Design a protein with these regions (language model features):
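Short, conserved charged micro-motifs
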Residues: 20-21, 62-67, 108-112, 145-146
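Short amphipathic beta-strand starts and helix->beta connectors
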Residues: 36-43, 82-88, 113-125
């Protein structure tokens, strides 16, 4: 007979904190404006929060790479996972400058969610995994199984940043 005890559960999410990104962008711009090697490069970093994008621009690819390095260092300092960034191709912009768009990953894409669910199912642990919009919910009777699933997921690389939230225990 099924017990009426509610399941323990947690959510697997992928979220980037935009206020932290905003801070990192401001700090990166400050450093870029002070750097002698980037002085005349007309470099810029613009966060477009509504689009979950960062736009980078600089006078050439070499300087754009330097701008990216500065930004990444500032993001790491603010605990923003670099795995949560997807880099578009470098394209020509106005004049002789180049630009690049970075997309901030918010939510788990359906293909990735399916891979995560499959890994959990194949592990034969006594849990259920279900896709709920842009997150995956894992539930099970015993907490140890949930802990094992977390360990399993930490060891797997889906090429995305994942966090475990909404841990509910009975």
């Amino acid at each position: 007979s099924k017990s009426t005890m509610p399941d323990n559960s947690f959510d697997i999410v992928s979220k980037i904190e935009l206020p932290e990104v905003s801070n990192a962008v401001q700090q990166a711009m400050k450093e870029i404006q002070q750097r002698f090697d980037l002085k005349d490069s007309h470099s810029s970093i613009e966060l477009r929060e509504k689009e979950n994008k960062i736009l980078l621009q600089s006078s050439d690819e070499f300087k754009l790479k330097a701008v990216t390095d500065v930004l990444q260092a500032k993001l790491v300092k603010r605990s923003v996972p670099l795995k949560g960034l997807t880099y578009g191709t470098v394209t020509p912009a106005t004049g002789s400058s180049v630009r690049q768009e970075i997309t901030l990953q918010q939510g788990i894409a359906i293909e990735k969610a399916r891979e995560i669910v499959k890994l959990i199912k194949d592990s034969k642990k006594k849990v259920q995994a279900s896709i709920q919009g842009d997150l995956v919910r894992v539930s099970g009777k015993d907490r140890d199984s949930l802990q094992e699933v977390m360990a399993l997921l930490r060891g797997a690389d889906f090429g995305i940043d994942m966090q475990f939230t909404n841990y509910r225990t009975n």
